[in-house]
Design a protein with these regions (language model features):
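Conserved Class I S-adenosyl-L-methionine-dependent methyltransferase catalytic core
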Residues: 4-26, 30-37, 41-45, 51-124
Length: 124
């Protein structure tokens, strides 16, 4: 049944997807497979902006992909048990290969959907 919650979930679903896909592309889960890291350590290792990375990391925590121990600059991030099992490239159970590059291959076409619907040019 369609509800306000379902409508909001559908409208905001891309955020969770993009957060996960970017984490896979950047190798976040594999980096955390080496051990817990602060946001600053992750930024150095992955070449990220500290200003942009902290909300992204906290978003991954709120969605259950990561855990955080502590708060502020001293907070430590680590993979959840499931993320370590399924999203670390070094794991035999890695499923991220199915998703790698998806943002580039698929989302680019979806971004042009409204233009395509208006002018008839293919986007997908």
């Amino acid at each position: 049944m369609l509800s306000p919650e379902r409508i909001l979930q559908a409208g905001l679903g891309f955020r969770e997807s993009q957060m996960l896909l970017s984490a896979l592309e950047l190798g976040l889960f594999t980096e955390l497979g080496k051990g817990p890291r602060t946001a600053q350590q992750l930024c150095r290792a992955l070449g990220l902006s500290a200003q942009a990375a902290s909300p992204w990391l906290d978003g991954l925590v709120s969605r259950g992909f990561l855990e955080r121990d502590g708060a502020g600059d001293g907070a430590i991030y680590l993979n959840t048990r499931e993320a370590a099992h399924f999203l670390d490239r070094k794991s035999a159970a890695y499923v991220g290969a199915e998703l790698e590059g998806l943002g580039e291959r698929v989302y680019a076409g979806w971004e042009a959907l409204i233009r395509s619907l208006q002018d008839g040019a293919p986007s997908l």
